[in-house]
Amino acid sequence: MKHRIQHIHFVGVGGSGMSGIAEVLLNLGYTISGSDLNESAVTRRLAELGMRIAIGHDRANVAGAGAIVTSTAVAGDNPEVLAARAARIPVVPRAVMLAELMRLKRGIAVAGTHGKTTTTSLVASVLAAGGLDPTFVIGGRLTSAGANARLGQGEYIVVEADESDASFLNLLPVMAIVTNIDADHMDTYGHDVARLKSAFIEFTQRLPFYGSAILCADDANVREIMPFVSRPITTYGLSPDAQVCAQDVQADGTRMRFTVQRRDRDVVLPALQVELNLPGLHNVRNALAAIAVATELGVDDAAIREALAAFKGVGRRFTQWGDLPVPAAHGGGTFTLVDDYGHHPVEMAATLAAARGAWPQRRIVLAFQPHRYTRTRDCFEDFVRVLGSADGVLLTEVYAAGEAPLVAADGRALSRALRVAGKVEPVFVEDVGELPQAILDFVRDGDVVVVMGAGSISKTPALVGELA
C-alpha cells in the first residue's frame, strides 16, 4: 500500500475505532490527517502525535490525501466523502483498513456482543508480558498504555472485531475469540437471530485451516454454533467441560482469585493460580480467553499471572473514581464512584453483580442513560428487570445516537415501568447535564454509585468530582 499511497485522511478520526487505526498507520510512517465534528481528548492527543486534525467537516480537508477512511457513523453525504468520490480518491471503510493492517502481521481478532474491549486489552497485556510485543487496536483506552492502539515489533496484532455492522467479516485473523452472542444491533441482521449466529460462524470460517477459534463454552448461543465451526476449537469458561476452565472462583474486593485447569487435547497442563485485577465473573471469562490465547502461543505461566495481577483496566470499564464526600446536608461521609460503558441489559447485570461482589454490604445506586431508542424498545423488559436489581436508580432520557424518538421507548417510559414494577423508586432526570447534582442529592454515606451508559453520560463522573 505504502508505495502508492503516502497520505491517508480519516473522517471521524475521534471515534474509538478510528483513532487507533490512524495512530498505528502514523507510526508505520504514513502522513495522517483527520477530521471530527467535535474536539476531544482523543483529537488533541492525535494532534500532539503529529496528525493534522480539523474540527468540522469540509471538502478542503481531503486535499492531498491518497485515500480516506470512514466508519459506518459517517453519512454518505458527508462533504469530505463527496469530495473524495468526485476526485476519485478511494473511500475505504474502517474495517477494510483494519483488515489491511492485519495482513501485515498475524491477526488475533476478538468478537462478541459483550466483553470485546476488555478481552482484547487482556490479550494484548498478556502477550506483552510474555515478550511478544504485539500491535493492538482496541475500542477503549488501555490504561497501562495510555492509548487504545500501539505499534509493536512482534509478529502479532490484536484487534477488536465489530459485529454491530457485520464489518468483522472483512477480517482474516489466524486466531479468533468469540466471547458471547446476544441480540443487539439487530437492524444489521434483519432482526433475525439465526442470521446473527450465521455471521459469527462465517467469522470463524475466515480463519485459515491451521487457525484457532477460541470460543466461550458458557454462552448458549456460542455453544449452538460450535458444531458448524470447521476450524480447530479451544473452549473456555466456568463450565467444567471447557478446555480452559476456572475453578474455585472467589471475589476479593475488586479482584478475583481462581484456579485455571487447562487441557490441550488429551494433555493436561499444570494448574494455574490466578489473581485478576478486575471484578466479576464476566471478567474471569474474559481473562480465560486471554489465557487460552497465551497458552497456545507459548507464553510462560509466570508472565500470564503477572499480567493479570497487574492489569490496570480499560477506560470506562468499571473505572473507579475513588471515594467522594457526601454533602453535609445529607449526613456527610463518603460514597464510591464507578464509571462503566455498559449499555445493554446483559452488560449492566454483569457490572452490577461485580459491584455487589466487591462491596456486598453496601447500597448499590445505578445512574443510567439508555443508549438508542431501538435498543430501549427491543430490550425494554430486560432493562426494567436489571434496573430493578439496583438499590437506587437515577434514570436520564435516552441518548439518541442519531435515532428519532420512539413512542413508549424513552426514559420516562422506562421510569414509569420501573415504578410500576415496584422494586425501586426511580429518580428521572431528563437533562443529563443535571445528573451530577442529582447524584449528590441522592447519595448517602457508604453508597456505591455506578454511572453507566455509552452516550454523553461519560462526562458525568468528572462533573460529580468537581461538584463534590
UniProtKB/Swiss-Prot annotation:
EC number(s) on file: 6.3.2.8
Superkingdom assignment: Bacteria
Reaction catalysed by this enzyme: UDP-N-acetyl-alpha-D-muramate + L-alanine + ATP = UDP-N-acetyl-alpha-D-muramoyl-L-alanine + ADP + phosphate + H(+)
Subcellular location: Cytoplasm
CC per GO annotation: cytoplasm
Keyword DNA-binding: no
Pathway the protein contributes to: Cell wall biogenesis; peptidoglycan biosynthesis
Family per record: Belongs to the MurCDEF family.
Functional summary from the UniProt entry: Cell wall formation.
Name of the protein this chain belongs to: UDP-N-acetylmuramate--L-alanine ligase
Protein species of origin: Bordetella parapertussis (strain 12822 / ATCC BAA-587 / NCTC 13253)
